[in-house]
A protein has these predicted regions:
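Structural motif corresponding to alpha-helix initiation and N-cap regions
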Residues: 9, 38-41, 63-67, 85, ...
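Donor/substrate-binding cores of folate-linked one-carbon enzymes
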Residues: 77-179
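N-terminal beta-loop-helix "entrance" segment that forms/cooperates
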Residues: 31-51
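A generic structural signal for well-ordered alpha-helical segments
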Residues: 48-51, 70, 124
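Hydrophobic N-terminal alpha-helices or hydrophobic patches in metabolic proteins across all domains
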Residues: 2-16, 49-53, 74-76, 166-168
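N-terminal Rossmann-like dinucleotide-binding module
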Residues: 1-35
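Internal alpha/beta domain cores that form substrate/cofactor-binding pockets in large enzymes
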Residues: 21-25, 54-73, 78, 85-104
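Amphipathic, non-transmembrane alpha-helical secondary structure
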Residues: 9, 13-17, 67-71, 89, ...
Length: 179
């Protein structure tokens, strides 16, 4: 599993509570926050540590060290939700069935960062959460599941939170179907 912000937590929790084994969590390193500039682990790192899942914190998936850790767990499938970086081709090939990604937009319209904010800013009436087979490139690959979401008066944060909650079961459905 690869993810960093709070939006990735519902999917991590759902996978951990399911019949699927989460063998490694990859996330960004602790970040400084607040007036005291205290280092805080990512929300994903906190949840994984409490669940007893091995955590690898890295700013890049291109290093040999992180590649070795991913290869060592011999995962069947990788799941990505808002990790915050591109996955290099060598790492994409490590899990037996590759990687799936939950993206909070109607692909391919809003590939990349801040898709919910862009959909709202551009006045879209709807968006979608998409689970897709991750390929080399930015948010590219065959879409396995698309769930349309109406954009109302909620803030981008509220809409993202709702999509993150709903997206967790969407990911589980796709992962179950790939077995």
């Amino acid at each position: 599993f690869a993810g960093t912000p709070e939006a990735a937590v519902p999917t991590l929790r759902a996978l951990h509570a399911s019949s699927h084994e989460v063998v490694l969590v990859i996330t960004r390193p602790p970040a400084r926050r607040g007036r005291g500039k205290t280092l805080y682990p990512s929300p994903v790192a906190e949840v994984a540590a409490r669940a007893g899942v091995e955590v690898a914190e890295t700013t890049t998936l291109k290093s040999a060290q992180i590649g070795e850790r991913i290869a060592a767990v011999a995962a069947d499938l990788g799941v990505v939700v808002a990790y915050g970086g591109l996955i290099p081709p060598a790492v994409l090939q490590m899990p037996t069935h590759g990687w799936v990604n939950l993206h909070f937009s109607d692909l391919p319209r809003w590939r990349g960062a801040a898709p919910v904010q862009w959909a709202i800013r551009e006045g879209d009436a709807t968006t979608a959460s998409c689970v897709f087979h991750l390929e080399e490139g930015l948010d590219t690959g065959d879409v396995y599941s698309r769930v349309e979401v109406r954009i109302g008066r909620e803030s981008a944060g509220e809409l993202l939170d709702a999509m993150a909650q709903a997206g967790a079961s969407q990911v589980l459905d796709v992962v179950d179907g790939l077995q």
